[in-house]
Swiss-Prot record:
Name under which the protein is recorded: Small ribosomal subunit protein uS13
Signal peptide, first to last residue: none
Organism: Allorhizobium ampelinum (strain ATCC BAA-846 / DSM 112012 / S4) (Agrobacterium vitis (strain S4))
Alphabetic keyword roster: Ribonucleoprotein, Ribosomal protein, RNA-binding, rRNA-binding, tRNA-binding
Entry similarity comment: Belongs to the universal ribosomal protein uS13 family.
Molecular function (Gene Ontology), one example: rRNA binding
UniProt entry tagged with the keyword NAD: no
Length: 122
């Protein structure tokens, strides 16, 4: 099992698909990495030589921000917004949708489970 960017990628899958198991690499970046390294898209992970795995690993380390670094940057950007006190930061702080979605109905994913309200009795 190959280990790239701190993630064990599955050996039976095609390399393009296996690279998407790394946080920060989607199908587009995976294809781009394969082209930079010069590998066929049909290759499977277990068919790769150690040199090819090393080339993929070096390309990712050099050109892409993945896993912990990407998560840390995202968290720092959100924290910066909250410290500024801007509208987006306030929405993050209150746990509400940030990008203008309606909240009168829906937004349950962001707001959490519905709180019961005592209705009037008949």
């Amino acid at each position: 099992m190959a280990r790239i960017a701190g993630v064990n990628i599955p050996t039976a899958k095609r390399v393009v698909i296996a690279l998407t198991y790394i946080h920060g690499i989607g199908p587009k970046f995976a294809q781009e990495i394969m082209e930079k390294v010069g590998l066929s898209a049909d290759r499977r992970v277990h068919q790769l030589t150690d040199a090819e795995v090393l080339a993929i690993r070096e390309t990712i380390d050099r050109d892409y921000q993945v896993e912990g670094d990407l998560r840390r940057d995202t968290a720092m950007n959100i924290k910066r917004l909250m410290d500024l006190g801007c509208y987006r930061g306030l929405r993050h702080r209150r746990g509400l949708p940030v990008r203008g979605q309606r909240t009168h109905t829906n937004a349950r994913t962001r707001k959490g489970p519905a709180k019961a309200i005592a209705g009037k009795k008949k």
